[in-house]
């Protein structure tokens, strides 16, 4: 698959619950997170990313991985940029694969390495990408299912572990309550004063505490959740203008800027990938 330099594209994927991205760009992505597991391979150039796991660098033929909700950024190692392919999986797909492999319920998993030099993982990824994204060449559901399970199985066996909870989550802390209020309605015109009142702290305490626990300040987190909400509306068939309004953006241009900044693609490209 060829594409113009300096572009991020979301091609159509033939597997339900999986989204694909192809990129050749020097774009620096701000801190953000995804609501899916992301697996990819660097094809050329180099990529640098910082997350809660530290600063990592990936080069050609390296695999890159990210967990749902894991805040990270991304920039090229030099002005030449980098080229990569990614597949983003609904979390339930990993849970199902882990349960089938172990024979036990597996509610939570996380990928342990942001970057890995794993030739087998690279080959399994490339096989799945070829049959899931380059559909006209392999229109075979069985081949896609086999490739999907082989990749997920390898990731679960070699690169995943169940996370250790540091504390009980029976009762939400004040920052978690503020996050939950944004999650409940990202389109709402909330203020810091609203969130601080819910959390029982000052606006300054809320701002510092939210950024510390979530890795993003409240406004950036809400913008990210609005992009997720807009994607959901687009997936349901809403027009771009209606999706922008429903997600709380000022207008369609506002939504487009947020998409490009966080995802590198326009809402129109995302909509086309779903058709």
For each predicted feature, which ranges?
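N-terminal positioning helix adjacent to the helix-turn-helix/winged-helix DNA-binding module
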Residues: 170-178, 214, 223-226
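His-enriched metal-coordination microenvironments in redox/metal-binding proteins
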Residues: 34, 219, 241
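Amphipathic alpha-helical segments enriched in hydrophobic/aromatic residues interleaved with Lys/Arg
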Residues: 100-167
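Amphipathic alpha-helical interaction segments
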Residues: 143-150, 173, 177, 194
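Basic, amphipathic alpha-helical hairpins
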Residues: 127-139, 154-162, 178-190, 210, ...
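Basic/polar phosphate-binding segments, predominantly the helix-turn-helix DNA-binding elements
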Residues: 183, 188-225, 235, 244-273
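Short, charged, intrinsically disordered terminal tails
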Residues: 161-162, 272-275
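N-terminal regulatory/effector-sensing and dimerization cores
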Residues: 3-106, 137
